């Protein structure tokens, strides 16, 4: 335990009410499927509103890939309640369709038959669609159908000046806050393998997902591929394999180096993309021919974030106003849970992220960067292997020993959160994770394989059974009339807003894309 962490724990202990002001938000992606478990080919239901302008129900890559977004709230229980209500509303509009329960996709149609999300005729709507066409061109449509949970978290704004004073730091509050979030991200890189062990839930997938590509997976049955000790094949290197992004590892030494590396990637041509061009047969196929079309194309396990103004790019927001929160992007959907995540997981994530924020976080050199990546990939592919060793400070250490050590340190943050909020919910959440470390059969990834074995099911059969169970849960609990009407109003207003944007649109789309592209080059640190 570092002296720095001890000092910061004492500071928090003297300011416990502040810990009630952390903010949390969840984004859950899930595929719409037919009642037989095939990808829905229907358009995004109009009764859910506009995917462009509805702030709570939208689409991700595909017209069939829904995304539910909660507001940012101080209590994770409220966040999960909001997410659950959104599921209940959506099920009131889905007819016979289902929401697919796990992260790895259902039976997919031919690559060209996976529908790309549509956002209407406004320039911003077209830009979102062309960006997704570019993703299809660069990475294939199949990979874009993987779903996940994103967990957004911020520390209280009032805490940063106290920490800065305690550290004797002379930066501005804004710069100190940004540096502290980047330090959190460095520690997240060091320790996120633990989340993969505890919450990874994708040890198997449908054989058709790989489209005949070479792989190192084993056959579980005629339709299912898996690895016996895998925790999260979703986060393994069978997912995104991008030669263009291979050399792009944004430096997490400070905010400026991070935004600078992304800005360069958005402005640097990549020869294979240049060869294709932005148009084929007069149609847009990608926004530009650079390493990244836009910043969000960079695939990472965690992102520093700042809420953007209308028309503002993420890098512009970060550069001008600093980091506001982090977005954790490596969490699998738990197929046993109706909304894919529960309060126990959320409470542990809060303690884990607080630990990452407050523990000493030295800069990562190239050697440690590689070690972090290796540990992460080892755990997603074989995290439950008995006696598995990772590397800490260049030396081997058994996963179980390191995990128990980390949980002991994170436990001090859980204790503080419980003191601030009353009760012992965070301590219980921590104990549930220690139980998984002691007994790997309790992990979600082990449970998935165990259930498939018990029922003699393929991945698709298991997933469809879970999806139907959750559908029944939601359909049997319609929303109270008042809440249902609030969602209906949100949907109607979003459709009206999209219509207004389209009617008021001025200017040519090509010029709009040019201006959008130029905006990134005008930013200076």
From Swiss-Prot:
Reactions catalysed:
L-cysteine + L-glutamate + ATP = gamma-L-glutamyl-L-cysteine + ADP + phosphate + H(+)
Supply the name of the protein.
Glutamate--cysteine ligase
Q: Which family does it belong to?
A: Belongs to the glutamate--cysteine ligase type 1 family. Type 1 subfamily.
Report the enzyme's class at the first EC level. Answer: ligase
Which Gene3D superfamilies does the record match to this protein? 3.30.590.20
PANTHER family from the xrefs? Answer: GLUTAMATE--CYSTEINE LIGASE
Q: Which UniProt keywords apply?
A: ATP-binding, Glutathione biosynthesis, Ligase, Nucleotide-binding
| MF GO annotations | ATP binding; glutamate-cysteine ligase activity; metal ion binding
* Pathway recorded for this protein: Sulfur metabolism; glutathione biosynthesis; glutathione from L-cysteine and L-glutamate: step 1/2
Organism domain of life? Bacteria
EC code(s) of this entry: 6.3.2.2
What GO biological process, any one, is recorded here? Answer: glutathione biosynthetic process
Q: Which GO terms describe its cellular component?
A: cytosol
Q: Which HAMAP family match?
A: Glu_cys_ligase
Q: Please give the NCBIfam families that the UniProt record associates with this protein.
A: glu_cys_ligase
Q: Oxidoreductase among the record's keywords?
A: no
InterPro entries assigned to the protein according to its UniProt record, in alphabetical order: Gln_synth/guanido_kin_cat_dom (IPR014746), Glu_cys_ligase (IPR007370), Glut_cys_ligase (IPR006334)
């Amino acid at each position: 335990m570092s002296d720095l962490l001890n000092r910061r724990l004492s500071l928090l202990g003297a300011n416990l009410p502040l810990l009630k002001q952390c903010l949390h938000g969840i984004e859950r992606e899930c595929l719409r499927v037919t009642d037989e478990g095939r990808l829905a080919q229907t358009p995004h239901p109009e009764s859910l509103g506009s995917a462009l302008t509805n702030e709570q129900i939208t689409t991700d890559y595909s017209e069939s890939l829904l995304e539910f977004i909660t507001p940012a709230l101080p209590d994770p229980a409220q966040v999960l309640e909001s997410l659950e209500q959104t599921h209940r509303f959506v099920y009131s509009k889905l007819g016979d369709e289902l929401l697919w329960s796990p992260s790895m996709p259902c039976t997919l149609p031919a690559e060209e038959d996976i529908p790309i999300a549509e956002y209407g005729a406004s320039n911003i709507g077209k830009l979102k669609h062309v960006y997704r066409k570019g993703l299809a061109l660069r990475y294939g449509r199949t990979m874009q159908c993987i779903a996940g949970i994103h967990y957004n978290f911020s520390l209280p704004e009032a805490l940063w000046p106290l920490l800065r004073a305690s550290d004797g730091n002379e930066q501005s509050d804004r710069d100190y806050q940004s540096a502290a979030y980047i330090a959190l991200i460095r520690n997240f890189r060091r320790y996120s393998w633990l989340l993969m062990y505890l919450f990874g839930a994708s040890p198997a997938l449908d054989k058709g997902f790989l489209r005949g590509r070479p792989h190192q997976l084993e056959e579980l049955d005629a339709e299912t591929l898996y690895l016996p000790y895998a925790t999260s094949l979703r986060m393994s290197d069978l997912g995104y394999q991008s030669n263009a992004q291979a050399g792009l590892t944004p430096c997490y030494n400070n905010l400026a180096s991070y935004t600078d590396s992304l800005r360069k990637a958005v402005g640097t041509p990549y020869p294979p993309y240049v060869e294709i061009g932005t148009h084929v047969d007069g149609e847009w196929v990608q926004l530009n021919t650079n390493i990244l079309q836009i910043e969000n194309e960079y695939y990472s396990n965690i992102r520093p974030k700042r809420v953007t103004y209308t028309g503002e790019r993420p890098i512009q927001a970060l550069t001008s106003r600093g980091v506001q929160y982090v977005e954790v992007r490596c969490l699998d959907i738990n197929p046993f849970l109706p909304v894919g995540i529960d309060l126990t997981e959320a409470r542990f994530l809060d303690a884990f992220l607080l630990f990452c924020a407050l523990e000493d976080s030295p800069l990562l050199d190239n050697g440690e960067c590689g070690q972090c990546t290796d540990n992460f990939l080892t755990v997603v592919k074989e995290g439950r292997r008995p006696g598995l060793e990772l590397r800490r400070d260049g030396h081997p250490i058994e996963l179980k020993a390191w995990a128990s050590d980390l949980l002991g340190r994170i436990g001090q943050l859980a204790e503080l959160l419980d003191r601030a909020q009353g009760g012992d919910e965070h301590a219980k959440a921590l104990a549930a994770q220690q139980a998984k470390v002691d007994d790997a059969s309790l992990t979600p990834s082990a449970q998935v394989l165990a259930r498939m074995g018990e029922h003699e099911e393929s991945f698709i059969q298991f997933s469809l059974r879970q999806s139907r169970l959750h559908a029944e849960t939601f359909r049997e609990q319609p929303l109270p009339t008042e809440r249902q009407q609030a969602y209906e109003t949100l949907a109607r207003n979003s459709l009206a807003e999209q219509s207004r944007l389209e009617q008021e649109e001025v200017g040519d789309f090509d010029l709009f894309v040019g201006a959008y592209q130029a905006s990134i080059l005008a930013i200076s640190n």
